[in-house]
Structures are given as structure tokens and as C-alpha cells.
From Swiss-Prot:
Its EC number is 1.1.1.-. This is Probable voltage-gated potassium channel subunit beta. Belongs to the shaker potassium channel beta subunit family. The active site is at Y54. Expressed in roots, leaves and flowers (at protein level). Probable accessory potassium channel protein which modulates the activity of the pore-forming alpha subunit. Coiled coil: none annotated. One of its GO terms (biological process) is potassium ion transport. Gene3D superfamilies: NADP-dependent oxidoreductase domain (3.20.20.100). PANTHER family: HYPERKINETIC, ISOFORM M.
Amino acid sequence: MQYKNLGKSGLKVSTLSFGAWVTFGNQLDVKEAKSILQCCRDHGVNFFDNAEVYANGRAEEIMGQAIRELGWRRSDIVISTKIFWGGPGPNDKGLSRKHIVEGTKASLKRLDMDYVDVLYCHRPDASTPIEETVRAMNYVIDKGWAFYWGTSEWSAQQITEAWGAADRLDLVGPIVEQPEYNMFARHKVETEFLPLYTNHGIGLTTWSPLASGVLTGKYNKGAIPSDSRFALENYKNLANRSLVDDVLRKVSGLKPIADELGVTLAQLAIAWCASNPNVSSVITGATRESQIQENMKAVDVIPLLTPIVLDKIEQVIQSKPKRPESYR
């Protein structure tokens, strides 16, 4: 496993990380989570991602209990969680000072931890002044409940505004953004965020490297495997949107490239994401140890992605966004 700094911070995170979205509390219980997490550690993963909203908090409970029972040293791992959707009440969601503080304390209780390493604002909140959110995230850091803070699915403008507020108030700005990034979702990472890397040293922990499994090739025959996330009731609409013929045709076109390198489609897709120098860590998911073992081999695929190979991939997927002319 390779380790990178998370943005311009001194925090080292594994190139590949593990996220609890969908799986913990929906498809996996504590016993299964323990084997999955230990398999990740055995492959050098030190970074594990969660959120207060995942399985309505159950994902944090499962991860916390699993880590406790595994007996891991807290200093050996990097844990992140995300705040925004905490419950049904009017103050149980969003990025007000009240919800950030109360939501963080509730997450730590579920995780059974004194702190998380990174706390994300899970979405932007137009109803709360950015100064209030920045102050609240700094309060959480000052209390020792989190060491760093970041954003998830924010726009470049919103992140720039957060940094502007932090600079004005002489406070800590966000060091990391968590966007979707894969061969079919590239605009933010490759164009919109370009000024953020230069101006603020923002790092990225990207999610959905396999486009919800589409880039594994398992949906290419049209049928949805019963153990896949698209088989879950909540993800039926996602399945209909993602499994369009054009995308599946492109995935099929990637197969010869993967075969030539002697790797799987999943390994190729994950390595492709990790090869972007602005990506600090690629968040992966899995329901079985065998999936983790396959995914982790993507680290060895990164050096194989020469400019020639990347060009071959681009000719198939044809999804490269145009860079804005105004940015140098």
C-alpha cells in the first residue's frame, strides 16, 4: 500500500480506503464487518470513512464495535465521518452550529471514540451562513473531537467561500473535499476544482470509483446480481439511470485494455482514479473479503497506467471534460 498526504495537511492516508456507505447496517453486521475491516488492514488500508446518515447511524455503531473488538490501536488508523442528515427534527440536519456540535457528539458516541481524524460537512447548507459553519467546525477541532475538517459534494465556489471566511476569521479552512469520481464522473475533479488545488491545497477522497459497480462489468449482460447494491430497493432508480446502453458499451470496450494488462476491470477503474495526482485516497466498498483482495491489487496497477494506456482508455470512454480557458 502507498500513503499520501491528505491535501496539504501532514495526515497520511492510504491510497485506497474503505467506506461504509450502503454496506454497514444494510448488507453487513458486526461479525461480517470485522472480517472486512481486518482484510483491509491486512492490505495496508489505514483510512475508514463513515457518516451519521449511513443506515441511520447504525453504520457508525457497527464500525466502532468492530474496531473495538478487533483491538486496533486508535493511532494506527484514520477515521472520518460526515455531518448533515442526523434525524427528523428541524435542527437535526444541516450545518448550523447546533447540529454540527450535537451531531458530532452523537457520531462519536456511536463510534465509541474520543475523536475522528476528519469531519466532513456532508453537503452544503444554503440556509446557514458560511461563517457559522466555519466557526462550528473550528470549535469541534478546538475541542479535540476532530483533527481536520472537509467538505463533501460542495462546489468550488462554496469551498472558496469557506476558505474566505476562515481566512477573515483567522480560522482553519477545509483541507479535503469528497466528490464522486470515476471514468464517467469527471467534471468537478478535473476542471472545476483546479483552482482549489493551487490556491488552497485541497486534497480529495473520492467515492464511487466503480460507478456503483458498473465498471466491474458485472451488469454488462443486463441482469442485476442479487447480491449487488442495485438489487437493494433504495437503489433501483440509480440502476435505471446508470445502466444505459452507451455506458455498458464503453465498459465492454475497456475489457480488452484490462486483459492486455492482465488485470480486472475493477482494478483498472480504481487504479485510474488513484493515478490522478490530486486524489489523496480512493474510497472503495465491499461486501466480501474477495472483493477487497481484488480491489487492493489496484495499487499495483497504477504504475502500468502509462500515457499510452491512459490514451487508449480515453479513446473508449470519451469522457474527458474540457478545461476552462480562463484557468491557467
